[in-house]
């Protein structure tokens, strides 16, 4: 990987998070000249350091993608927590559901991995690629789309030219805004409070989620025996919970999780992330593609955000490589629409499903409370339907891009 003064590229990827870096990896060692841009330097990773506050529940499909990119071996050898079961229940009734990876013949339902470690493993792959140029830090200031290329102007005065501009710079994507692609979005007025805690009882490689009227709380197993708490609350109570002292926070998590792992005995400092629903009106324009959170954002109650983004990346990489192999213009709108057809409807279905679940479980109208409890019990007992839900959440159903198979 180089840091050159070149200003002309085949693909410029704005945003060097998990999805953007993964796309660069998918295009490494090809005859395409790739640039990655980010406002920050890549995050530093040190084995044995305190775990990153941001951990992801990677689906088996995401694991396969990272394996195909050559990053999984580093992740597996460093720090990963597979979970084989998941238990979900409603705080205001007797509805509950139990998912087990054995029911669908998979070794795990998913894998809890630090955001920082995933990026580190991907960057190790990029370091050996001679067709990748890293331009960090760099901030886009203007975009001009021409017939044959995009000109991307940076705040430091540089100008980059590319056949294809990919926006992977998050839900507040500056690139998407500069291009002028609209979104349908709504703030939930909630925050996800995140911390790593120690509990009296072992997590048994199980993820736990309890739906409270105020928002879901999830306990995700970590490799070192702790669990990662992801607790979604309205803004005001979230701030109260976040600022509790350690003892009071541990007691609050114990109560909210119904003591499923016994008392919470220790905690890290807390972090908070604002929650919203967002979907771009279009994923592509001539010479432009959106991917990951730049195209969509979802409620974290099912941990699907990064998994959706990695599937986006895999589909876009497939479209780019297929076009290049056929000597077609990788920035042509007819080429890029293949990517939009592959991902937009699928992502919309997931966004609406998660939004519906969020609203259903936060509504205390008696008929809806009865409906969700009856529904949970029914799905738990009807194995074919439960298996279908599991395979969908695990990224194992539908038409998958080659990297995810």
Residue positions per predicted region:
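Glycine-rich FAD pyrophosphate-binding loop
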Residues: 28-51
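Conserved FAD-binding catalytic core of PHBH/FMO-like flavoproteins
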Residues: 66, 149-270, 275
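FAD/FMN-dependent oxidoreductases across multiple families
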Residues: 239-331
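C-terminal helical "tail/cap" subdomain of flavin- and related membrane-associated enzymes
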Residues: 318-405
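N-terminal Rossmann-like FAD-binding beta1-loop-alpha1 element of flavoenzymes
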Residues: 9-36
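N-terminal FAD cofactor-binding segment of flavoenzymes
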Residues: 50-91
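Conserved Rossmann-like nucleotide-cofactor binding loop
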Residues: 19, 42, 172
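Conserved N-terminal helical subregion
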Residues: 7-8, 78-178, 186-191
């Amino acid at each position: 990987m180089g840091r050159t003064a070149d200003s002309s590229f085949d693909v410029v990827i704005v945003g060097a998070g998990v999805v953007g870096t993964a796309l660069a990896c998918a295009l490494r060692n090809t005859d395409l000249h790739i640039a990655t841009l980010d406002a920050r330097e890549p995050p530093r990773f040190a084995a044995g350091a305190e775990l990153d506050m941001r951990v992801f529940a990677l689906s088996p499909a995401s694991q396969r993608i990272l394996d195909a990119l050559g990053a999984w071996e580093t992740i597996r050898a460093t720090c990963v927590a597979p979970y084989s079961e998941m238990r979900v229940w409603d705080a205001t009734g007797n509805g509950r559901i139990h998912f087990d990876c054995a029911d669908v013949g998979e070794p795990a339902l998913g894998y809890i991995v630090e955001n920082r470690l995933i990026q580190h493993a991907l960057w190790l792959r990029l370091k050996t690629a001679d067709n990748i140029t890293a331009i960090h830090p760099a901030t886009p200031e203007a975009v001009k789309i021409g017939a044959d290329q995009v000109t991307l102007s940076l705040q430091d005065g540089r100008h980059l030219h590319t056949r294809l501009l990919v926006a992977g710079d998050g839900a507040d994507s500056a690139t998407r805004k500069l291009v002028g692609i609209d979104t349908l979005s709504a703030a939930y007025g909630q925050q996800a409070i995140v911390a790593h805690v120690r509990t009296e009882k072992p997590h048994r490689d199980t993820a736990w989620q309890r739906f409270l009227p105020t928002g879901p709380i999830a306990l995700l197993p970590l490799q070192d025996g702790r669990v990662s708490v992801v607790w979604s609350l309205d803004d005001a109570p979230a701030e109260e919970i976040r600022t509790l002292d350690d003892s009071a926070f541990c007691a609050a998590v114990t109560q909210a999780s119904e003591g499923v792992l016994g008392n919470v005995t220790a905690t890290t400092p807390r972090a908070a992330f604002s929650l919203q629903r967002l979907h771009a009106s279009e994923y592509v324009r001539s010479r432009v593609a959106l991917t990951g959170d730049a195209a969509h954002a979802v409620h974290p109650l099912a941990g699907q955000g990064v998994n959706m983004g990695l599937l986006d990346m895999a589909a876009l990489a497939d479209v780019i490589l297929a076009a290049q192999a056929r000597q077609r213009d990788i920035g042509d709108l007819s080429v890029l629409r293949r990517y939009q057809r592959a991902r937009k409807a699928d992502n919309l279905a997931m966004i609406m499903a998660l939004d519906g679940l969020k609203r259903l479980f936060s509504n205390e109208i008696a008929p809806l409370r009865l409906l969700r409890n009856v529904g949970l019990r029914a799905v738990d007992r009807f194995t074919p339907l439960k298996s279908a839900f599991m395979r969908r959440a695990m990224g194992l159903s539908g038409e998958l891009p080659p990297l995810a198979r």
